[in-house]
A protein has these predicted regions:
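A short, Lys/Arg-rich alpha-helix, primarily the initiator
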Residues: 1-54
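Short alpha-helical DNA-recognition segment
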Residues: 47-74
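DNA major-groove recognition helix of helix-turn-helix/homeodomain DNA-binding modules
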Residues: 79, 83-101
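Short juxta-domain linker segments that transition from a proline/glycine-rich
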Residues: 109-212, 225-231, 242, 463-464, ...
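Structural detector for internal amphipathic alpha-helices that build alpha-solenoid repeat scaffolds
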Residues: 153-167, 189-206, 227-237, 259-274, ...
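Amphipathic alpha-helical scaffolding segments comprising HEAT/armadillo-like alpha-solenoid repeats
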Residues: 169-184, 206-218, 239-251, 272-290, ...
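Short inter-helical turns and helix N-cap capping residues of alpha-solenoid HEAT/ARM repeat scaffolds
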Residues: 187-188, 219-223, 251-258, 290-295, ...
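Extended alpha-solenoid helical-repeat scaffolds
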Residues: 192-200, 209-232, 241-264, 278-289, ...
Length: 528
């Protein structure tokens, strides 16, 4: 259960949940993290009356969720898990977008089997007529391309509640194709809802081969522009075909981004026990080949994967790196962070303290260590999945915009190392919104591609703006790179009218025309 930091306020002890698990632990205290999100959403609400737990409990009861002050405290401290219905009621009472809080638990619950079903989705009765009727409606919406993110999430819940449901092969294929092709265009809340749907569908044995086929077909398109998101589903699919695809991504990646995705997927599948002995052997050979080709780069790029390998192989590689003077690999493998703990803690604390001061409401709790912990994980954790989940949690909290403000301020400091600045930029991509548009544009020509690329992608997650659209179009270069590909991403995701002109142009470079045509076939971003 989550540790809690307390302070006395209005005659009661207010508990702020904290995940006390070690940074390098294989699992986190999900209940504490959800409890923190609940309490911060309430305590930083614009209605000051909600800071009184008794008032808020009464508001939940008025909205149809009978709740005591004691139960509220236990939810928010992480002592007991909250039901999905109660989280949805939190959202209604606080006036938050539907899914702002609950989609996080649906997302996490779909990827962590130990999470109780009642936390991850609403209560469903697969034996009832209403369930069957609604399932039919959701399938029709999805097959016809009319399903919104909320519909997909609900479809995922229904299929996970009835994993033995019989559907025609053509129906499974249509659902898989639609999910795989739509997922790369989702952002923010829609991303969490679509992803939760995909993860739940992946739990259905009958669906797994269709999902792998859809991913393989999608990735085989020579003009494909976004590969990480749909390919990321492979770690949920314990099939031989999925394992082979992951190993291919590590061995023969089309670019550095694909390689990084492959390393993450291989590490995840290794941890889940998805590889056969023969696949283990192939993975070992790939790692050794990469190591011999460039030991210095391999010790950096493969740290996440090496950390999860059997002790013999892991120890051999760490020893070799240490003997060659590259001690960082041993530290990263042992401690779970890419930089020294004191440095990670200091930077995260600095950012969290600044961000908290920027949030308008100032509830009187003494200390919140969870935000610091989440910022630290999002920026510096060795494991991609852990960083990703921490970033999503911050983005759903009242601190997302403020943390992005502070990150952008720190990013402007050129004294930071390029690696640190790339991590700052990556987290900004998760958290930025319309208020950050001009500052994102200011980094369009940053000298480091790993910095400007995620920031340009962040522009693509915002609605179309004539200003940024013209600036991005004018800055397009002739030669393909990750940064230039990101500019096409930004134009396409925002629905730029210039995309059609690029596709038709006889003067535009071939890679731009190919990218524009691919995006025309996909469509712009999905926010709902």
């Amino acid at each position: 259960m989550g540790a809690s930091l307390t302070t006395r306020r209005a005659g009661r002890v207010q508990q702020i949940a904290y995940d006390a698990t070690p940074i390098n632990a294989s699992a986190v205290d999900v209940e504490a993290r959800i409890g923190w999100l609940l309490s911060m959403s309430r305590l930083h609400h614009s209605n000051p009356d909600f800071r009184d737990g008794r008032v808020f409990a009464a508001a939940l009861a008025d909205a149809g969720m009978p709740t005591s002050r004691s139960l509220l405290s236990r939810w928010e401290s992480g002592e007991i898990p909250i039901s999905y219905e109660a989280m949805a009621t939190y959202e209604r009472v606080l006036g938050l977008p539907e899914g702002q809080i609950s989609s996080i638990t649906s997302y996490v619950g779909a990827i962590m089997p130990r999470i109780k079903t009642r936390l991850a989705r609403p209560k469903l009765d697969p034996s009832g007529l209403a369930f069957a009727t609604r399932l039919d409606e959701l399938i029709e919406l999805a097959e016809d391309g009319q399903a919104r993110a909320r519909d997909w999430q609900e479809l995922g819940w229904h299929l996970s509640a009835a994993p033995l449901v019989h559907l025609r092969g053509s129906t499974w294929a249509a659902l898989a194709d639609r999910l795989v092709t739509d997922l790369p265009r989702t952002v923010k809340l829609a991303y969490r809802q679509y992803s939760a749907a995909a993860f739940n569908v992946a739990l259905v044995p009958r669906a797994q081969s269709f999902l792998v086929d859809a991913i393989a077909s999608y990735a085989a398109d020579p003009d494909v522009q976004v590969i990480s998101t749909p390919v990321g589903l492979l770690d949920r699919l314990p099939t031989r075909a999925a394992a082979e695809l992951v190993l291919d991504l590590v061995e023969n990646p089309s670019n550095d981004t694909v390689f990084g995705t492959g390393v993450w997927l291989a590490a995840e599948k290794l941890g889940k026990g998805h590889f056969t002995p023969a696949e283990h052997d192939r993975l070992d050979m790939i790692v050794l080949q990469l190591w011999r080709r460039d030991p210095a780069r391999a010790s950096e790029d493969l740290a996440e994967l090496i950390a999860g390998m059997p002790e013999g192989m892991r120890g051999t590689l760490v020893h070799a790196a240490t003997r060659a003077g590259r001690r960082k690999l041993g530290y990263v493998v042992e401690h779970g962070e890419q930089i020294m703990a004191t440095r990670a803690r200091s930077l995260a604390q600095q950012l969290a303290d600044r961000a908290r001061r920027l949030v308008p409401q100032e509830p009187a709790y003494a200390e919140d260590r969870m935000l610091t912990r989440l910022v630290r994980e999002a920026l510096f954790h060795r494991d991609s999945e852990r960083s990703h989940l921490a970033a999503l949690l911050i983005s759903s909290s009242p601190f997302g915009r403020a943390v992005a403000d502070c990150l952008l301020e720190m990013l402007a400091d050129q004294d930071q190392t390029p690696w640190t600045r790339s991590r700052l930029a990556t987290l900004i991509r998760y958290l930025s919104d319309e208020t950050h548009r001009l500052r994102l544009i200011s980094f369009l020509d940053d000298p480091h591609e790993n910095v400007r690329t995620p920031l340009i992608q962040g522009i693509g997650h915002l609605p179309l703006s004539a200003v940024s659209d013209q600036v991005v179009r004018a800055s397009l270069g002739e030669h393909l790179s990750l940064g230039e590909r990101a500019k096409m991403y930004a134009l396409a995701m925002s629905g730029s009218p210039g995309l059609a002109a690029i596709a038709r142009s006889s003067n535009a470079p071939q890679w731009q025309r190919s990218a524009a045509r691919w995006w025309q076939g996909q469509g712009s971003s999905l926010h709902h």
